[in-house]
Amino acid sequence: MLTRRSVFKPDGLKKLDFEYVPPRLPHREEYVERLVDFLRPIIERPGAISERVLITGRSGTGKTVTAKKTGEIMERIARNRGKKLIYAHVNCRATGSKFALVQRIIHQVAPALPVRGYGPIELLHALWDYLNEHDCFLLLTLDEIDYYIRTTGEDIVYELTRLTDEVKNVPQRINFIFISRNGGFLNVLSPSTLSKFRPQERFDFPPYNELQLRDILAERVKEAFNENCVSEEIIDFIARNTCKYGHGDARYAIQLLLAAGLIADRDGYPMVIPEHVREAQEKTDPRLRDEDIVVLNEHQKLLLLALARSLADRKEAVFLPIEEVEEAYNVVCEEYSKQPVGRVMLHALASELKAAGIIVIDSNFRLGLDGVKAEVMERFLENLLGKGR
């Protein structure tokens, strides 16, 4: 009897949200420490200089969460020292105009300030006046700044950064963290904007590797899922798929984990199984096309059908030994009145399917499926091959 108890803890879904900032950031703690060290003068010598940092890296490399964690720590340090520091984080992709960008900044820093009836430049000066009147300092992250400049222009960025320079003999109230996929957008800035914008420090974030993704997923599983609902094998499965298909994107990995958990709940399972991950991947980022299967030769299709059936029967398995798949293959060949190939040729067929990106093979030559549910693959192949005898 399948239980209807959720695999998630009561607040588990929040712990898998992209906006969530976990207590620990595996494999990004060093970057947080370096950022805090670089930005520490904001607190130790407030107003002496406007600090500007650029963080670059592909999607899912931890740029946003690292900036937010840095902001949390900087606010805490300032509070403990009796200083007023506000951290604000604006995703520029969600702002389609200069006004919308400034409005989002003000909403986080001084929500009581009226914004209607004013232009973006007037609002920037109102923000500056607010910071001066309240003796506050601002650490502002402009996330996806490259997208904003490409689609909206550089004017407001110039005005923001110029604001800290044009008023002399007063504390520099605004400090910046800029986040971008890469630093290429700097090359398209006008000389006047670049002179104001140019960061003093740059941090380049590499993609996560498989071991690092395992650590990240393991932490999220502890926070989000009930005990024994996600096995180490499932964590390894998602980490490996993320490296193979998601290019080390931690967001992709967490998205797969969340989707697989929701599928487990939908089907009434007490734990996440490989089929849930395969279905989640199929929905999140489908990899296999019908034509990829249609063009296979006859025995490749028969072997693939044998693997799909075996995995559908063994829902808890990520991989199956080649010997077990060979037994199923022999049964399938008998069903379709075909002479099975020998073991050497069977290994060659499996290697060909792997090279085509249709199956995966681990270091022990166990076979598995990625990107599609075993049951879906089984039905498709049975329709393609027709009914056996």
Task: Write out the residue ranges for each language-model feature.
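Conserved C-terminal helix/linker of AAA+ ATPases
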Residues: 263-288
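Mid-core helix/loop region of P-loop NTP-binding domains shared across ATPases and GTPases
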Residues: 2-13, 17, 45, 67, ...
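Conserved catalytic segments around the Walker B and adjacent sensor/switch elements
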Residues: 53, 77-94
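Terminal-proximal interaction/regulatory segments of ATP-powered molecular machines
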Residues: 311-389
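Short alpha-helical segments that sit at the start of domains
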Residues: 286-318
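A short, basic N-terminal segment
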Residues: 1-50, 73
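Walker A/P-loop nucleotide-binding motif
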Residues: 46-71
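AAA+ ATPase "lid" subdomain C-terminal helix
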Residues: 243-249, 258-271, 311-314, 355
